[in-house]
Design a protein with these regions (language model features):
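Single conserved hydrophobic/aromatic residue that forms the stacking wall/gate
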Residues: 342-352
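N-terminal phosphate-binding or glycine-rich loops at protein starts, especially the Walker A/P-loop
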Residues: 1-45
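Short Gly/Thr/Asp-enriched flexible loops that form oxyanion-binding sites at enzyme active sites
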Residues: 18-22, 103-117, 177
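Short glycine-rich or small-residue beta-strand-to-loop segments that form or flank ligand, phosphate
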Residues: 2-9, 66-71, 96-99, 164-167, ...
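Glycine-rich oxoanion-binding loops at beta->alpha junctions
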Residues: 44-99, 104-105, 137-144, 148
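Short, acidic/small-residue loops that bind anionic groups at enzyme active sites
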Residues: 113-143, 190-194
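Accessory alpha-helical/coil subdomains and C-terminal extensions
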Residues: 96-101, 109-111, 139-157, 167-262
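C-terminal non-catalytic interaction/assembly regions of soluble proteins
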Residues: 244-344
Length: 352
């Protein structure tokens, strides 16, 4: 069997580990051939590919990014896009596709499967917001990067007696903000799942200063104040209809400085959260997902996504995985609140 592999959407630590596992087992165990399509769905759309063999994936396990490149190309927004993909797969003798990506990439995979393309999906997103899987690779790396940044920011915030607002990724789900904020000892965590009252946040900040400690506020890029307005970097939409978020951290810092009279600064972690070497957890998870994906292809189990449920790697229908996003349950946020800030004058310990 000749199998195509592609990576779509934002880059993510662990992508190369998936590619490596797929190719190594596919060649050594099953004797399959592989072709890597470049730059997401743009590859099969335009026939852009490269050969993939065991020698091509040697040494890529610890590397961030993806050796195949990526893009946010949506073939369903391009004239004759589906027909072009089918024609290029046939021209290159590709019998099946393994698509590694998030909600958009796997959404395309779901539609192509329904149109007769043999496809298996592998979930990828640092946001950890894909349904039907407990964890996605890249999330653990992003959380560790954000946590280390928060750890470092505590000392500079306290040295200068200022509020530091740390903006992390998370369009619709605040998993990174919640986990990194808790692990880094943040005093306030703001998620897309729950609108926040900026006056209440200012009150928490003032109480922190009353105890002679400088506050750290962690905010997901998709968090919204009570008026429900997202802060956007610009009004442009990508090929999947997403706006570009950015600026909630700066807006919040300005509001807090005005309301508390204390200096507030913003740190936007941005793309650093999804760059560089994956953690051990993400390398192992990505490898296990890749091994299960090539098993599914070999067995002809099309239209499935491999997923982590509890500690097991299972297969679920692609349609189920892309039906809805996995957001942070409010009870998870509620159980964390006791660790975030103090409301008692007797509380004089640091939050971490």
């Amino acid at each position: 069997m000749r199998i195509g592999v592609l990576t779509g959407g934002g880059d993510c630590p662990g992508l190369n580990a998936v590619i490596r596992a797929v190719v190594r087992k596919g060649v050594a165990t099953y004797g399959h051939e592989f072709v890597g399509f470049r730059d997401g769905w743009k590859g099969p759309l335009e026939g852009l590919s490269r050969p993939l063999d065991i020698a091509d994936v040697r040494g890529i396990l610890p590397r961030g990014g993806t050796i195949l490149g990526s893009s946010r190309t949506n073939p369903f927004k391009i004239e004759n896009g589906v027909e072009r993909i089918k024609d290029n797969l046939a021209a290159q003798g590709v019998d099946a596709l393994i698509a590694i990506g998030g909600e958009d990439t796997l959404g395309v995979a779901t539609q192509l499967y329904e149109l007769g393309v043999h496809v298996v999906g592998v979930p990828k997103t640092i946001d950890n917001d894909l349904g039907a899987t407990d964890y996605t690779f890249g999330f653990d790396t992003a959380v560790n990067i954000a946590m280390e940044a928060i750890d470092r920011l505590h000392t500079t915030a306290e040295s200068h007696h200022r509020t530091l607002v740390v903006e992390v990724m998370g369009r619709h789900a605040g998993w990174i903000a919640l986990h990194a904020g808790l692990a880094g000892g943040a005093n306030v965590i703001l998620l897309p799942e729950r609108q926040f009252d900026v006056d209440q946040v200012a009150g928490y900040v003032e109480k922190r200063f009353q105890h002679q400690y400088a506050p750290i506020v962690v905010v997901a890029e998709g968090a919204q104040p009570l008026d429900g307005q997202m802060v956007l970097a610009n009004q442009e939409l990508d090929s999947f209809g997403h706006v570009r978020l950015g600026g909630i951290g700066q807006w919040l810092a300005e509001q807090l400085e005005a309301k508390t009279g204390k200096e507030a600064r913003t740190v936007v972690l941005g793309h650093i959260q999804r760059g560089g070497t994956p953690t051990a957890f993400d390398r192992v998870l990505a490898t296990r997902l890749g091994l299960q994906a090539i098993d599914a292809v070999h067995e002809g189990d099309w239209g499935k996504m491999v997923a982590m449920q509890s500690t097991d790697i299972v297969r679920v229908p692609l349609a189920e995985a892309t039906r809805e996003l996995k957001t942070v349950p409010l009870e998870r946020y509620a159980e964390a609140e006791v660790c975030l800030f103090y409301t008692s004058d007797a509380a004089d310990d640091k939050a971490r």
